[in-house]
Amino acid sequence: MIFDLEKNNFSEEIIYDVCIFGAGPAGISLALKLQDNNKRVLICEAGDENYSEQSQNCYKGIVKGDEYFDLDVTRLRYLGGSSNHWGGWCRTFNKMDFNRGDIGEYLIWPIEKKDIDPFFDETAKIIGLPKPERLNYRESISSNFSLESIEFDYAGTNFNTKYINVLKKSKNIDLLLNANLKKLIIENNKIKSCDIISYNFSTKNISAKNFVFAMGGIENSRQLLWQQKINNENLYDTQIPVGKYWMEHPHYTLGNLVLKKKFIFSPMFERSKIEVGFIQLKHDIQKKLNILSCGLRLEWPGYTNAKQIIADLACYAPNLSKEIFDLFNQNLMCAARVRAAWEQLPSVTNNITLSLKERDKFNIPRPILNWKKNSFDKKTIKATLDYFSQFLLKEDMGRLQVDDWIN
């Protein structure tokens, strides 16, 4: 059932099996699974059923370091969470994603790919992947270079619209809207209950056997740090690096590409539509170059922009540009913008901390995101681009023009 703390229509006095903070993809998925196991669940969603300024305002924060999005732009604070605006790009992990001990021991996960594989089919169904088989697609694109293409599948599932009726009808799940976590009540080193508060300052104490934070990486860290502080550091071991090692998959445009030949692998673009595919270095060459994974995405820029890219090529490769213009006019070549998303090296200085000055409506310190790219980021980008450029030259596929900021 769905209740609203703002309207004072929630009067349940039971002890829930699980109380979940956050009704985004993680919180809703967990609640549905617990419901199937006959558990009584309460989801406390800090926002409303739809977007509201009063809720979204609580997501404002401070960014220090490299330029980044405003923190209230990248996140949405209402039912469905980030699924209300995500693109739904999905792909499976590789075995190597869980173990890059060749770079450092801190890049070895405590779990392996085989530990999550049994949950793939169930997960694909929950998020509505239309063609999950695409995610296993990997194709070598050269016998001489360790390059492969991979595909993404696009769910784009909005957990608000997909599951709201399920939540309304559920007998085991209670969803409480406009319910902001105010304080965890700790007794004998265990969370016994919590105080929640609405925007009109209605309050409620909730008891549960277990509590789950599913508010997203930034908000989880913010609340854990704050709850630890107001509970005299009795919530968790102070040695646990809460808020530390914050990471992003940075997305940047790296340059322009002209192709003399069509690629021989499937997830590529046509002039009429984009089939977004990624090219990445295989793991053997990543290890050899001592870099992390970096996916290159080629985007068809449209006819006019493609001509401009080729025209720019004439400035530094006039002989090649004439050949390419001839192919372009015969519809035999492609131009593209090259974008990348790469994996970052964990850094303890990239973290979430609490502001000493700015607070939200409920007097909770706003988060500070401290984030900077480092020399390893640049090493990963440059090594990937250099290797891809060598492939283009030696296979006589085309030319890559790198943007100035890379160098």
Segments predicted by a language model, with ranges:
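Redox-cofactor-proximal catalytic regions of oxidoreductases
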Residues: 60-133, 348-352, 356-360
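N-terminal Rossmann-like FAD-binding beta1-loop-alpha1 element of flavoenzymes
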Residues: 16-43
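FAD cofactor-binding and catalytic pocket of flavoenzymes
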Residues: 239-365
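Residue-level detector of alpha-helix initiation sites
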Residues: 24-25, 218, 375
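Conserved redox-cofactor binding core of oxidoreductases
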Residues: 102-191, 406
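Extreme N-terminal leader/targeting segments of oxidoreductases
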Residues: 1-18, 36-37
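Glycine-rich loop(s) and the adjacent beta-strand/alpha-helix scaffold that form part
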Residues: 36, 49-50, 184, 195-269
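A glycine-rich dinucleotide-binding beta-alpha-beta segment and adjacent secondary-structure elements
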Residues: 176-187, 333-344, 364-407
